[in-house]
Curated annotation (Swiss-Prot):
Belongs to the CidA/LrgA family. LrgA subfamily. Its main location: membrane. The gene is lrgA. The lineage of its organism: Bacteria, Bacillati, Bacillota, Bacilli, Bacillales. This is Antiholin-like protein LrgA. Keywords: Cell membrane, Cytolysis, Membrane, Transmembrane, Transmembrane helix. The keyword Transmembrane applies.
Amino acid sequence: MVILEQTHLVKNKTVDNKKSMKYSIFQQALTIAVILLISKIIESFMPIPMPASVIGLVLLFIALCTGIVKLGQVETVGTALTNNIGFLFVPAGISVINSLPILKQSPILIILLIIISTLLLLICTGFASQLLVTKSLFPSKEKNEETSHVGG
């Protein structure tokens, strides 16, 4: 049974790969580059500072949800970028090292900020997930098991 399920998953994966291979890697990279270019233009007109990469992610999400961009148009390049994300953080790490004199001025404040922001992120994520589960947008397994036992 497990082997059949794994074979089914592999077959579905190859079907998905064939859909995304309909577009060349160049076309996929160009699609992502155009979205990033649009986000750079939007960034220049925004009254508040917001990174173009964040704007680009939101634009890509909206484009995927509305069907303007199909998943196959960005899937292969997106997967490659995600698989190599550690390599993409090297420039950011070098920037931090170049900013060490600034960071040395108030290390306790920076550590405190990191701890507080992490705790706030955990709390907000917990509340958001609880809200989603209680509103039945994403029902938990426990609720599914309870409802299946009631009827049978």
